Design a protein with these regions (language model features):
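N-terminal Rossmann NAD(P)H-binding glycine-rich loop of SDR-like oxidoreductase domains
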Residues: 4-20
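SDR active-site strand-loop-helix element
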Residues: 7, 30, 59, 100-106
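Adenosine-cofactor binding site in Rossmann-like domains, unifying the SAM/SAH pocket
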Residues: 30-45
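NAD(P)H-binding glycine-rich loop region in Rossmannoid oxidoreductase-like domains
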Residues: 45-79
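Short-chain dehydrogenase/reductase
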Residues: 77, 126-134
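Short alpha-helix in the Rossmann-fold core of NAD(P)-dependent oxidoreductases
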Residues: 77-84, 101
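Conserved Rossmann-fold NAD(P)-dependent oxidoreductase catalytic core, especially the SDR/UDP-sugar
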Residues: 86-127
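Single conserved hydrophobic/aromatic residue that forms the stacking wall/gate
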Residues: 133-143
Length: 143
C-alpha cells in the first residue's frame, strides 16, 4: 500500500475524507493536534519525517478569517507560506513524493464565492490569505 502524508489531516477535511483515504493508503497525519501521528508546527519547524511518502496531501493552513492586525497577517504568512517551505524542506530530505496535492482557497483567484474556476483562471487575489497561498503554490512548484 502506498504511503500518504496528510498535513492538517485531523481537521475538517481529514475527518471527512480520512476514512476513504485509509482504504487506499497507509495514511500518516502531520500537524499540531494530539491526534496527529507526527507532531509538528510547520509554521515554526521543519518536521522530522520518518521516511519517504508516495503522496502528500497538504491541507493545513489558515483561511476563512480576515486578519485585522499586522500580527494576524504575519500568522497567515507563517502558517501558509513558511509552513509550506518547511514541509518542502522535510520532503526533500526523505525524497520527493510522486504527487503533492495542495489544498488552497478560491481567494487566490480573487473570488469570494462560487463560480466555475479552471486552471486558466487568472490569479489575482489581493488578501493576506491569497498572497500567502500564492507564495506557497510557487514554493511547491520548485519541489
Amino acid at each position: 500500500m502506498e504511503e500518504l502524508l496528510f498535513t492538517g489531516g485531523t481537521g475538517f477535511l481529514g475527518k471527512n475524507i480520512g476514512p476513504v483515504l485509509d482504504k487506499m493508503y497507509n495514511v500518516t497525519t502531520c500537524g499540531i493536534t494530539p491526534h496527529d501521528d507526527i507532531k509538528a508546527n510547520l509554521a515554526k519547524d521543519v518536521p522530522d519525517l520518518p521516511h519517504h511518502y508516495d503522496v502528500v496531501l497538504h491541507a493545513c493552513g489558515k483561511a476563512h478569517v480576515v486578519p485585522k492586525t499586522e500580527a494576524e497577517k504575519q500568522l497567515f504568512f507563517d502558517i501558509n507560506y513558511i509552513g509550506t517551505i518547511h514541509l518542502c524542506n522535510a520532503l526533500e530530505k526523505v525524497g520527493t513524493p510522486k504527487a503533492l496535492v495542495f489544498i488552497s482557497t478560491v481567494a487566490v483567484y480573487g473570488c469570494e464565492f462560487g463560480e466555475l474556476i479552471t486552471e486558466e483562471h487568472s490569479l489575482d487575489g489581493d488578501t493576506p490569505v491569497s498572497y500567502t497561498h500564492l507564495r506557497a503554490h510557487e514554493t511547491e512548484l520548485h519541489l
